[in-house]
Amino acid sequence: MKVHEYQAKEILRRHNANVPFGKVIDAVGDFEKAYNEVVQKSPVVVVKAQIHAGGRGKGGGVKVAKTKDDAKAAAEKILGMQLITPQTGPEGKKVLKVYLEQGLEIAKEYYLSILLDRAIRKTIIMASTEGGMEIEEVAETHPEKIIKIQIDPGIGIQGSQVRELAFALGIPTEAQKSFTALVNSVYNAYIKEDAALLEINPLILTKQNEIIAGDCKMDLDENALYRHPDNEALRDITEEDPYEVKAKEYNLNYVKLDGNIGCMVNGAGLAMATMDIVKLAGAEPANFLDVGGGANPTTVENGFRLILSDPNVKGIFVNVFGGIVRCDRVAVGIIEATKKVNVSVPVVVRLKGTNAEEGKKILNESGMNIVGVEGLRDAADKIVSLIKK
């Protein structure tokens, strides 16, 4: 689960990390009070759009203001704008919140992130002297400037590793105590908050030899949110895909894609195989949808509603293997859903496993325009041919 910059920094504060003072507003009417608090910390105020995407500065979503009038003008311009960045896509994202933050006297910018490397099964700290740039650009143009340090999960980060990192980055001697404190705080936040990613870009060395988190991106592990009810409250559904928000309400695992064949499958592995076979047949899947092992008529109906809410869908491929789930119950769900949801696109169904024959019989005797197919490749070819008619 992604959180906004101002929320990520509040989490860092809880772990005693050095972050700039700031105030968030969601209306221009709140500007005066917020500005008056921030300007007490610094005469320069940075006005930042709050969206779940990077590259905000390139899109005009970050402005440095040296006067109150400039800050207010920036806030008025950014609030409500459709901000387009390299990470939002051409449609952009509407800015509903703006963060007013104290300006800093910057001497040098670095990059720092903590994430899980699944290949080696360890947390890694990744850092670079090229702060303020997208790390992907650095990896492509100057890979030698990226430093990686592996952290053993059993013992955590060690003082020697922090010193190694400071040396590799060329942190001045006068700032190393501040650097050590921040790295330890950020690592503790990453571990204790069950984060999947914690990225600080830029990590700022001020002219006063302080190390401060200038920006912060945090992605929290959704599977661990039950341990952090306070973090659950940080979710901003206006920043999430509306289809995926609806899927959460239905308790379905759904990811929207760009194709035109809706896929309803039980089991993540089979769902991915189904998408592959659709592509092999010459079409593109419209979604990943795993209805899970407890599929029932209600689940199937909700799955149909979700798939058909995408206007790009021209056909539906239902692929079910009956292990825990019974194919006859799925068949009943398909028929009920087809009637209730008013399905007007072709539907191809492949049932295998527990009570598959009973399920096929139910579909055949339903009188509905549902095509039953035996083979996986045959089913993919069939739905592709039907949407082309």
Swiss-Prot record:
Gene Ontology BP, a term: succinyl-CoA metabolic process
Gene name of this polypeptide: sucC
InterPro entries tied to this protein: ATP-grasp_succ-CoA_synth-type (IPR013650), ATP_grasp_subdomain_1 (IPR013815), Succ-CoA_synthase_bsu_CS (IPR017866), SUCC_ACL_C (IPR005811), Succ_CoA_ligase-like_bsu (IPR005809), Succinyl-CoA_synth-like (IPR016102)
Name of the protein: Succinate--CoA ligase [ADP-forming] subunit beta
Residues at which Mg(2+) binds: N201, D215
Cellular component terms per the entry's GO annotation: cytosol; succinate-CoA ligase complex
Task of the protein: Succinyl-CoA synthetase functions in the citric acid cycle (TCA), coupling the hydrolysis of succinyl-CoA to the synthesis of either ATP or GTP and thus represents the only step of substrate-level phosphorylation in the TCA. The beta subunit provides nucleotide specificity of the enzyme and binds the substrate succinate, while the binding sites for coenzyme A and phosphate are found in the alpha subunit.
NCBIfam families: PRK00696.1, sucCoAbeta
PANTHER family: SUCCINATE--COA LIGASE [GDP-FORMING] SUBUNIT BETA, MITOCHONDRIAL (PTHR11815:SF10), SUCCINYL-COA SYNTHETASE BETA CHAIN (PTHR11815)
Catalysed conversion reaction: succinate + ATP + CoA = succinyl-CoA + ADP + phosphate; GTP + succinate + CoA = succinyl-CoA + GDP + phosphate
This protein's UniProt keywords: ATP-binding, Ligase, Magnesium, Metal-binding, Nucleotide-binding, Tricarboxylic acid cycle
Protein residues bound to substrate: N266, G323, I324, V325
One Pfam family, short name: ATP-grasp_2
UniProt cross-references to PROSITE patterns, sorted A to Z: SUCCINYL_COA_LIG_3
Listed GO MF terms: ATP binding; magnesium ion binding; succinate-CoA ligase (ADP-forming) activity; succinate-CoA ligase (GDP-forming) activity
Domain ATP-grasp, first and last residues per copy: 9-246
Entry's family note: Belongs to the succinate/malate CoA ligase beta subunit family.
Cofactor(s) for this UniProt protein: Mg(2+)
Subunit and partners: Heterotetramer of two alpha and two beta subunits.
Metabolic or biological pathway, per its Swiss-Prot or TrEMBL entry: Carbohydrate metabolism; tricarboxylic acid cycle; succinate from succinyl-CoA (ligase route): step 1/1
Regions crossing the membrane: none
EC number: 6.2.1.5
